[in-house]
Amino acid sequence: MNINIEKSLEKAREINQKRIPVSPSELVSLKNDILDLMREEKAVMVCHYYVDGVIQDFAVDSGGIVADSLEMAKFGKKTAAETLIVVGVRFMGETAKILSPEKKVIMPTLKATCSLDVGCDAGLFKKFCEKNPEKTVVVYANTSAAVKATADWTVTSSCAVKIIEYLKSRGDKIIFAPDKHLGGYLKKTTGADITNWDGHCVVHDEFKAFELMQLKKRIPEASVVVHPESPASVIDLADFVGSTSDMIKYVMQSDSKKIIVGTDNGLIHMMKKKAPEKI
């Protein structure tokens, strides 16, 4: 590692630890030095839509990707890079390592957690499943590797409906974890026999139907897109329900110029890049 890059990394650590404000020119210089180091180390950054917009742009500049958790891991498997810097919560790093065991997977911190993951303890969930041995166990990607190991199927929000419909066609009764709202949405959409684990996303669980109704009154021409981790009362008011990637596609293709978005604020950054003419 050359001296300039080493100094830049030390500066970046100091900025992060002490929350020191930086000028735009300093930020560009730091970014370029870190990108040079990443090229030396054959590393790319993969990050989730929910992280800060500056980090999303950095990931793209590194030759990496901004995506949902599954696409992050799939990209990691396909890329020629030897090291994956996964910017997201812990289960995303685990998923990337599962799909690319031969690659080095680095995360900025292992303390970045997801309430769905934390709210589904592997030991407790295993006991829950053992009480219902006749049921097929389906878990959401937003779980630890230990929880995934107890499951028959692992799904993402983009493929969950298709998988549940298939299992229903076989006559399966299902245990779904960890998100009770997503599980409720799947049960209502497919009519499958689903027993839900009592978990929720702390971000989406805060969305309230009455607040959404007030927004719709203020902006009646706006389309409403929400994530299926939202409460049922919010989902019922939406024009479109889908995964983060599907929400972006909907916004790009919609005739509506104004969109009310029901998910983490980080997704707005990519939506504005893909559909800058919309609000």
What annotation goes with each model-predicted range?
Residues 1-279:
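Active-site loop-to-helix "anion-binding N-cap" substructures in soluble metabolic enzymes
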